[in-house]
């Protein structure tokens, strides 16, 4: 039986799940927990409610309905996305192979305004350790982050590179890192280099020489996961076509991560379209 894995349990993710499971496709939703909807005190502009509804209540009803129809929800954090013979979402609870994946984790967090971070993207700044570790064999690199997502990237790099430095950029550690990883808690003032990364400048002016910086801030949102497969991204928005498919076959995105109007109604529509089109594509084989 074909299966779809959806990353995110907000309006877009649950809507996609409803349409996919009703189309006869085995559907699993991976969720780290409540998102932006749960922080909404009241919603007054959503179809079908005579009185304002709170975000948590709307979320509860939606998930309850999806479970009733057979959608499986798994509480875990997605940390990677790969494709060998099929798409696979890597999580803290294990790997979830899928015939199609829908990314619906909401809008990406703002990337810190570190000079050189975006300018050297693809020239020493990377968003995917599994994709690019090979190019840094025997070299000194850094991972920018402090949590489980950063740990996942560190573990992919350690067998390949000479050394890994963890740059927390002032944030507290929220994961246990291997002892061979050098942890630097200072703020990063700049990523250095002209043609390619040569190092980082830390608060106070100290410079650490490096050949690459891997970005793994916070949790792996939809944009970060899309980048891991080379899907087109414009700023913090995942590029999709009129069927909500990214530039990678079988990979879809819906909701705030695609940009535009950041509203529940828009997220529900895009989720419905992504779930419908993904299921339709699987039926065609």
Language model segments and positions:
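FAD-binding core/adjacent interface of flavoenzyme oxidoreductases
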Residues: 1-5, 73-138, 214-216, 238-246
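Hydrophobic structural packing positions in well-ordered secondary structure
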Residues: 66, 102, 125-128, 157, ...
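Active-site-proximal substrate-binding core of FAD-dependent oxidoreductases
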Residues: 39, 280-285
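Beta1-alpha1 glycine-rich phosphate/pyrophosphate-binding loop at the start
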Residues: 4-60, 65, 139-173
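Hydrophobic/aromatic ligand-binding patch that stacks against planar heteroaromatic rings
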Residues: 15, 19-20, 101, 156, ...
């Amino acid at each position: 039986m074909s299966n779809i894995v959806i990353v995110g349990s907000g309006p877009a993710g649950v809507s996609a799940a409803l349409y996919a499971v009703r189309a006869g496709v085995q559907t699993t939703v991976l969720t780290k927990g409540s998102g932006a909807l749960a922080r909404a005190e009241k919603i007054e502009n959503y179809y079908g409610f005579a009185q304002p509804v709170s975000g948590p209540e709307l979320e509860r009803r939606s998930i309850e309905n999806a479970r009733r129809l057979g959608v499986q929800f798994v509480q875990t954090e997605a940390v990677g996305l790969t494709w060998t013979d099929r798409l696979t979402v890597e999580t803290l609870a294990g790997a979830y192979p899928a015939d199609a994946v829908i990314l619906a984790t909401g809008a990406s967090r703002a990337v810190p305004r570190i000079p050189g971070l975006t300018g050297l993207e693809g020239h020493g700044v990377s968003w995917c350790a599994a994709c690019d570790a090979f190019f840094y064999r025997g070299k000194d690199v850094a991972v920018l982050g402090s949590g489980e997502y950063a740990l996942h990237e560190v573990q992919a790099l350690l067998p390949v590179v000479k050394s890994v430095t963890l740059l927390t950029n002032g944030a507290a550690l929220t994961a246990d890192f291997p002892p061979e990883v050098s942890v630097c808690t200072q703020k990063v003032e700049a990523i250095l280099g002209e043609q390619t990364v040569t190092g980082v400048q830390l608060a106070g002016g100290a410079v650490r020489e490096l050949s690459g910086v891997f970005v793994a801030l916070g949790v792996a949102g939809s944009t970060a996961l899309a980048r891991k497969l080379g899907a087109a991204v414009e700023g913090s928005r995942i590029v999709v076509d009129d069927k909500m498919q990214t530039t990678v076959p079988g990979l879809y995105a819906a909701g705030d991560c695609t940009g535009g109007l950041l509203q529940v109604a828009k997220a529900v529509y895009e989720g419905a379209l992504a779930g419908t089109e993904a299921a339709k594509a699987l039926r065609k084989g």
